[in-house]
Amino acid sequence: MAADEARSVSRLHSEEDMHGKHHSTLWGDFFLHHVPCRPGQYLIMKDNVEIMKEEVKKMLLDVGSSDLSHKLDCIDTLERLGLDYHYTKEIDELMCNVFEARDQDLDLTTTSQLFYLLRKHGYHISSDVFLKFRDDKGDIVTNDARCLLRMYEAAHVRVNGEEILDNILIHTKRQLQCIVDDLEPTLQEEVRYALETPLFRRLNRVQARQFISTYEKSTTRINMLLEFSKLDFNILLTLYCEELKDLTLWWKEFQAQANTTIYARDRMVEMHFWMMGVFFEPQYSYSRKMLTQLFMIVSVLDDLYDSHCTTEEGNAFTAALQRWDEEGVEQCPTYLRTLYTNIRATIKAIEEDLNFQNNKHAKLVKGLIIDMAMCYNAETEWRDKKYVPATVDEHLKISARSSGCMHLVSQGFISMGDVATSEALEWASTYPKIVRAVCIIARLANDIMSYKREASNNTMVSTVQTCAKEYGTTTVEQAIEKIRELIEEAWMDITHECLRQPQPKALLERAVNLARTMDFLYKDADGYTDSRSIKGILDSLYVHLID
């Protein structure tokens, strides 16, 4: 035991460890002192928003008797501005009316918008609605940029086997790329954003922040809606900052007591952003804080098993977590005993909070930590044996689950209280197809961006290496291209499962939001590990109010 501890201490001093390979926090104590607006200003904003909410509700009642195109535009605008969460019932009623009127003789632009919104809201609508627009060669031809954009967005809610949507996606993407530089500035901005991230895959707050600026330039804007969206955005930003103040205090104490700074990434603000991507609404403030705490612990465990502890230490620590008692950690070195104590203290505090809220699922929280530790420990066996799985599917059986997404969905449901039933939690724990698809997107997107770094760190082989082995590709680029195809298939599975609606829409939306968050974080870089790549976005969501 003494020799084991001595070896651990020696390693801490002799290695640069993870802290030397990843940049330090970009935020530090920033949110302990950052106050976006004065309390009086905040109350005035909330009062004004309540007035505007009622005005928009009246507007929606009027829209109910308007033509189909106007209904679609109204819903689309509210969703892009990030205001739709205030009007779930009203929009559901409008979408029901839209579905009943879907057989009208519509032009291609309106048909595309109709198709996109119905699919997004879980309605079954056949892609055959596009057949009538094909020419003699079987192509759908248009030179209208706005129409191309609508078609492009519609094609991104396809499911497997929809050949017409596959073709629409290929052709509209190619055409939009060709004409984007020649479009007028506002439309050009929309097209470039869509080519980077299609509408269905965008994060609510990121999309709202971007579209508010676009909408402000529109000659057809409704000024009250613009002002409403700005105030609502600023109110949520202020709430997020209050949460980050509390979380900063917790994280500073956890780091100091558990001494994780020497090997673990310090990404608490980025983790809050991750959770906010899944639960952005104000009523889920506790969900964001609880999940940020839980998954910061998961992040520490990821780094611990990945690059810091020995195999023997990992085995002992995993066994201790499985026992979950004071005696279980006695065989571990001092630094792991300290970490163990602080993990249990955080979990106990969360359980007490949930019990106080009369949440009957509090006892399930610690299972996240235990299961993630077991996943990470299993991965070290592959690493130590230098084993390369024969197929991507074999790899994903372990690595997709270790992405933590399955656990985030389950723990997210727990944090929602009565919104999630015991049946919903049981369903989530069976690793249903939609959750598996989210996990696959997370794992594959992460591996694409982290492949080079992790290949040089002697960590577990990634799906990139496994894909190259399975398909006999000669270059990393070819393997990555194949992996991108698998990601697209996973998105199609998500759309398909949302159309089946095995669970309430409010719960399915959390899984979709998680996929959107993973898409954002790993689109151009590993945005969690190298959070400098998303610093500008975080500034716009947490620091700067909209004037």
Swiss-Prot record:
The keyword Cytoplasm applies. Mg(2+) 1 binds at residues 302, 306. A motif (DDXXD motif) lies at residues 302-306. It catalyses: (2E,6E)-farnesyl diphosphate = (-)-(E)-beta-caryophyllene + diphosphate. Substrate binds at residues 302, 306, 443, 446. Mg(2+) 2 binds at residues 302, 306. Binds 3 Mg(2+) or Mn(2+) ions per subunit. Expressed in roots and leaves. Optimum pH is 8-9.5. GO terms for molecular function: (-)-E-beta-caryophyllene synthase activity; magnesium ion binding; terpene synthase activity. GO terms for biological process: beta-caryophyllene biosynthetic process; defense response to insect; diterpenoid biosynthetic process; farnesyl diphosphate catabolic process; response to herbivore; response to insect; sesquiterpene biosynthetic process; terpenoid biosynthetic process. The Asp-Asp-Xaa-Xaa-Asp/Glu (DDXXD/E) motif is important for the catalytic activity, presumably through binding to Mg(2+). Belongs to the terpene synthase family. Monomer. This is (E)-beta-caryophyllene synthase. It comes from Zea mays (Maize).
